[in-house]
């Protein structure tokens, strides 16, 4: 059944951030068992998103006044990151898609007018799947004004995750004056062209991140979200990296769990070298888990939660988020190598899950500008005469 026709779940009006996190925790094993069935080019975890809808998780990032659980609000960052981690532990492709849904809901609640927020919140409550399609190549999206106040889209987006299944993508496009404008496109009313042959990836095959040609589609002025340039407003643009890092930590946890299961199954738990590797892997997993809590606490530190866009707070929040994504990337890469050595060639054969987990996490770790992110954290440390005991706390 298409996501856009799903009925609202009664659970979504009963949830709190704690119960939303608990729902994701409960779903993780089912997501993991189901993951192989959508792991093919052109696949999509349709059934899994039905489960998320039934659990109220598609509406959970909405404010409580809009019928959600408030999971997307600043004081609930740790519950949100934990929810993303649990979903990523179940299936990284589902985690990637859900993170995009969360991002879109946060963006329209932050930058939308009251009437727009109510309209798009109703769509989320009705089961529509949102996403964010920003990446583009040379033929990027342009907005052409029409005489009737509408706009015609020209151009394409690459990596349109959930293409063909996301019914409310949040897009960005260039206005004639060069401004970068957000919009939310109602895809149950008109369809773009999907280039499915574009998506032949190493991993994350089930995310259906096709190239999307939007040329010729028209939108109303009411579909525009916020002012030009709002999409890149800090700290939210770069600071949002903590969300995908949380999903990545979940993927690392899945690899850890499967490694210990495999070693128990083959009777290698007494091997001193396996124990040493598991000790190293435990250290890495704990590091990722501690960083999730640290990231949430940093966002809520005095002043930053109430005045996040003040330059002094925004700059620090972005630098800390860049630290987190860098640490998580490093620990995941190290953990992947340790897991490979633990399970050997035998463990990398299907139907063991390591081959899929390795592909998915390796691919998902390739986020934009990793070197620049770490360099920015170093720049921040050099630009501010703050002692180490206060710099990142």
Model-derived segments and spans:
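C-terminal helix-coil-helix/basic helical segment that borders enzyme active sites and/or dimer interfaces
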Residues: 32-40, 264, 287-327, 340-348
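A generic N-terminal leader/anchor concept
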Residues: 1-79
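Glycine-rich flavin
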Residues: 44-54, 58-161
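Glycine-rich phosphate/cofactor-binding loops in nucleotide/flavin-utilizing enzymes
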Residues: 345-393
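A short core secondary-structure module
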Residues: 159-194
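Generic structural signal for well-ordered, non-transmembrane alpha-helical segments
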Residues: 250, 279-286, 322, 326-333, ...
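Glycine-rich beta->alpha junctions and the first turn(s) of the following alpha-helix
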Residues: 201-286
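Amphipathic, well-ordered alpha-helical segments in soluble domains
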Residues: 27-30, 251-258, 284, 291, ...
């Amino acid at each position: 059944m298409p996501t856009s026709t799903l009925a609202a779940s009664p659970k979504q009006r009963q949830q709190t951030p704690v119960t939303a996190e608990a729902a994701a925790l409960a779903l993780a094993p089912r997501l993991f068992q189901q993951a192989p069935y959508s792991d093919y080019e052109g696949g999509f975890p349709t059934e899994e998103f039905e489960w998320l809808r039934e659990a109220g998780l598609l509406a959970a990032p909405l404010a409580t006044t809009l019928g959600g659980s408030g999971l997307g609000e600043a004081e609930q960052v740790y519950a949100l990151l934990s929810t993303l981690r649990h979903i990523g532990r179940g299936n990284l492709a589902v985690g990637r898609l859900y993170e995009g849904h969360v991002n879109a809901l946060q963006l329209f609640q932050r930058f939308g007018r009251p009437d727009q927020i109510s309209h798009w919140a109703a769509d989320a409550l009705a089961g529509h799947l949102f996403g964010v399609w920003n990446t583009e190549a040379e033929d990027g999206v342009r907005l052409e004004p029409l005489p009737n106040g509408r706009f015609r889209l020209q151009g394409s987006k690459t990596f349109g995750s959930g293409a063909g299944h996301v019914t409310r993508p949040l897009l960005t496009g260039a206005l004639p004056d060069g401004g970068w404008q957000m919009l939310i496109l109602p895809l149950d009313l008109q369809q773009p062209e999907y280039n499915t042959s574009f998506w032949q990836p190493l991993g994350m095959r089930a995310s259906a991140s096709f190239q999307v040609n939007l040329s010729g589609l028209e939108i109303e002025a009411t579909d525009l979200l916020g002012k030009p340039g709002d999409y890149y407003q800090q700290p939210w643009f770069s600071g949002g990296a903590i969300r995908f890092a949380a999903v990545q930590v979940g993927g690392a946890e899945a690899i850890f769990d499967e490694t210990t299961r495999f070693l128990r199954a083959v009777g290698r738990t007494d091997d001193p070298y396996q124990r040493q590797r598991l000790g190293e892997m435990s250290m890495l997993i704990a590091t990722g888990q501690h960083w999730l809590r640290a990231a949430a606490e940093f966002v809520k530190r005095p002043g930053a939660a109430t005045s996040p866009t003040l330059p002094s707070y925004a700059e620090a929040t972005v630098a800390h988020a860049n630290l987190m994504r860098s640490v998580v990337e490093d620990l995941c890469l190290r953990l992947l190598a340790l897991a490979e050595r633990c399970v050997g060639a035998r463990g990398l054969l299907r139907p063991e899950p390591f081959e899929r987990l390795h592909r998915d996490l390796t691919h998902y770790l390739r986020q934009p500008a990793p070197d620049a992110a770490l360099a920015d954290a170093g720049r921040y440390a050099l630009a501010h005469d703050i002692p180490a005991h206060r710099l990142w706390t």
